[in-house]
Each structure stands twice: as C-alpha cells, then as structure tokens.
Curated annotation (Swiss-Prot):
It comes from Staphylococcus epidermidis (strain ATCC 35984 / DSM 28319 / BCRC 17069 / CCUG 31568 / BM 3577 / RP62A). GO terms for molecular function: 3'-5' exonuclease activity; DNA binding; DNA-directed DNA polymerase activity. GO terms for biological process: DNA strand elongation involved in DNA replication. One of its GO terms (cellular component) is DNA polymerase III complex. Belongs to the beta sliding clamp family. Forms a ring-shaped head-to-tail homodimer around DNA which binds and tethers DNA polymerases and other proteins to the DNA. The DNA replisome complex has a single clamp-loading complex (3 tau and 1 each of delta, delta', psi and chi subunits) which binds 3 Pol III cores (1 core on the leading strand and 2 on the lagging strand) each with a beta sliding clamp dimer. Additional proteins in the replisome are other copies of gamma, psi and chi, Ssb, DNA helicase and RNA primase. It is found in: Cytoplasm. It comes from the Bacteria. The keyword Transport does not apply. Keywords: Cytoplasm, DNA replication, DNA-binding, DNA-directed DNA polymerase, Nucleotidyltransferase, Transferase. This is Beta sliding clamp.
C-alpha cells in the first residue's frame, strides 16, 4: 500500500531525469519501469538500464513550499515511459498516487483517473553499492566543461570498447581526462584542490552524456565517488551511478609529436566560421575533407565538390613561427575541436603534412585537441 499527493510540474521534471536511465532494449522487463518508493519524509524515484542508474530524492518541501504530502508509505514499479506520458497530460496541478496490495495503482488529477498495473518493487534489482569514502569534488560548471571538451571525441564503434569511454586519470592531485576515437584526441587537465587518491578509470561516454543532460548550469558542487567497477556522481537530490568500462586505456602521450614545424595564432570564431562555410562543399563531396595551406600570415582553406564547384576562404593568422605547409583534415573534427576550446584565440601547431596537429587555447595547456590529417597532397 502506498499513497501520496505531489505537485505535478515538479514531479514531471524529476520523472524526466529518472527516465534518462531507462532503455526500452533492456533484457530485464522490470527495468523498463520507474521504481517509486514513498518513505515518511521523501519520495525516491529510481531508473536503471543496469549500465546507468539514476536515483532522485523528492523531499516533502523545497524552498519552504510543500511539494509532496505522503499519506502512506510503500513502493511500486510503474511502466516508465507510459507513466511519465500520463503524468504530463493530466489536467490538475497536483497528482495523487495510491496502490493496493496487488500493486494496482490509481492515478488521479482533476477529473482524470487512470488505473495502472504495477510490479512488485522487491523484484527490482538492487542498485550497485558505491562507498561514500574518498570523493573528489568539482563544481557542476567545471564538470560540464570537462564533458563538453572531451566527450565528443569518444569512439562510437564497439570494436574497441575502451575507446567508447573517457579515461579519467588522477595522478599527483591532477585530473587528466582523455577521449579518442583513433582519428582525434581530446585532453582536459585540471588541478584538484583537495588531496585525492590516484585513480585510473574509464567512464562510458554515453553515461557522461546523460549526466550532462540532468545537471543544471549551476555553481553547485558535485561529489564523485569511485568503486572498483562503478562511479557515483552525487549532486543536489540526484545520485547518478554508472558502470565503469573494463580494460586498459591506451597510452596516448606518445601520440603527441615534439618540435613543431609551424605554429600560429588564429581567432577561434573566424577560423570556425570559415571552416563551417568551406565544409558545405566538403560535405557534398561526401568526405568532409578541407585542404589548408599557410603562408604570408594567412591560412587558406579550400574544398571541392566535383558536381557543385569549389570554395576558398582566407583567415588572418598572427604570431606565425615557421614556414609554409599544406595539410588536409576532416572538417567536422576540426569544428568539434574549436568548439571545445573556450577561448577567443587558438594556437595551432603543425608537425608535418602527415603528422597529427594540435590545437589549444592561447597561453593555456589545460585543453589540448589533436587531429590526424588526411592524405590528399
């Protein structure tokens, strides 16, 4: 038996976040549901696909306003997406849920009434246990930046599963996050404020992407706890648990060449938009390839589509060191890298026509983007 009445708008927001952990393709039918657990002073929502689990605690009051009135404690598992769709379409400002001993659930709001067949919550798998010791703490803003600056570079191919995740290495109180799909590499470094144990884990890119969606742009802190095969992110009323990927992440430090041939500074926005325009033809050509040549403090970008025509763009460069160079690259990779650099001025280092090149913010080594060129010249 369970009964409570809750503010509908608040409930919808929390249900939407819980739903992000639920996959229709699960092998366990009960995991397509949301577990609802009404306790004396709070309601807990749980969603899981066995890879990612999200647990959200709804307190009785938020900022002095009553959110939920709990008449009787109890639990039930309700069909996730169907239940959320019902709550979204209900007419009233409040929703009342009550269950009987067979987990039949009555949902009422305004003049609407739904009866849903619930499942026994005791059949719902237990969430992984993650020790609350030895946390690292970041601000939500910083974590969202880390995800934006690395996660796009993970591999989407399952042939090397470790590359579908981001490597988080904690060493000497520095956090180094690395992602690569073998064609490009993104690295973000951060000095940690508190003493932290050394760690080397791989967090699935999909999990970080879902976590990013449910974190609001706030100055809140997020606590991150690691277990042998799980990671827990705790922020506000949300616990987000993800399975870690097994295996050894490749040593990517050897990919960075030494002694650049050419180094130049360039305006991030000008460079990005020029590549964006040139990529219109590159995409039509079917290969996303843009040719770049340097000389006379100019960067020239060009692309050709046999059916449509050609495009040429010029962007001013500054602080140019070295001679001239021609190189070709994937326009999408370059635009992703520039988007990840949160700085108006970008430094680009070239090491040769067929060697990887590096982009980073001017006078800042905390973000590094590496891209492998394409052989066209």
């Amino acid at each position: 038996m369970m009964e409570f009445t809750i503010k509908r708008d608040y409930f919808i927001n929390q249900l939407n976040d819980t739903l992000k952990a639920i996959s229709p393709r699960t092998t366990l039918p009960i995991l397509t549901g949301i577990k609802i657990d009404a306790k004396e002073n709070e309601v807990i929502l749980t969603g899981s696909d066995s890879e990612i689990s999200i647990e959200i605690t709804i307190p009785k009051q938020v900022d002095g306003e009553e959110i939920v009135e709990i008449t009787e404690t109890g639990s039930v598992v309700l069909p996730g997406r169907f239940f959320v769709d019902i709550i979204k379409k209900l007419p009233g400002k409040e929703v009342k849920l009550s269950t009987n001993e067979q987990f039949q659930t009555l949902i009422t709001s305004g003049h609407s009434e739904f009866n849903l067949s619930g499942l026994d919550p005791d059949q719902y798998p237990l969430l992984p246990e993650v020790s609350r010791d030895d946390a690292i703490q970041l601000s939500v803003k910083v974590l969202k930046n880390i995800i934006a600056q690395t996660n796009f570079a993970v591999s989407t191919s399952e042939t090397r599963p470790v590359l579908t995740g981001v490597n988080w290495l904690i060493q000497d109180n520095e956090l180094i996050c690395t992602a690569t799909d073998s064609h490009r590499l993104a690295v973000r470094k951060l000095q940690l404020e508190d003493e932290s144990e050394n760690k080397n884990v791989i967090i699935p890119g999909k999990a970080l992407s879902e976590l990013n969606k449910i974190m609001s742009d706030s100055d809140e802190d997020i606590d991150i706890f690691f277990a042998s095969n799980q990671v827990l992110f705790r922020v506000g009323n949300i616990n987000f648990i993800s399975r870690l990927l097994e295996g050894h992440y490749p040593d990517t430090t050897r990919l960075f060449p030494e002694n650049y041939e050419i180094k130049l500074g360039i305006n991030n926005g000008d460079f990005y938009h020029a590549i964006d325009r040139a990529s219109l033809l590159a995409r039509e050509g079917g290969n996303n390839v843009i040719k770049l040549s340097t000389g006379n403090e100019l960067v020239e970008l060009s692309s050709t589509s046999p059916e449509i025509g050609t495009v040429k763009e010029e962007v001013n460069a500054n602080d140019v060191e070295g001679g001239n160079l021609k190189i070709s690259f994937n326009s999408k990779y370059m635009m992703d890298a520039l988007k990840a650099i949160d700085n108006d001025e970008v430094e680009v280092e070239f090491f040769g026509t067929m060697k990887p090149f590096i982009l980073k913010p001017k006078d800042d080594d905390s973000v590094t983007q590496l891209i492998l060129p394409i052989r066209t010249y």
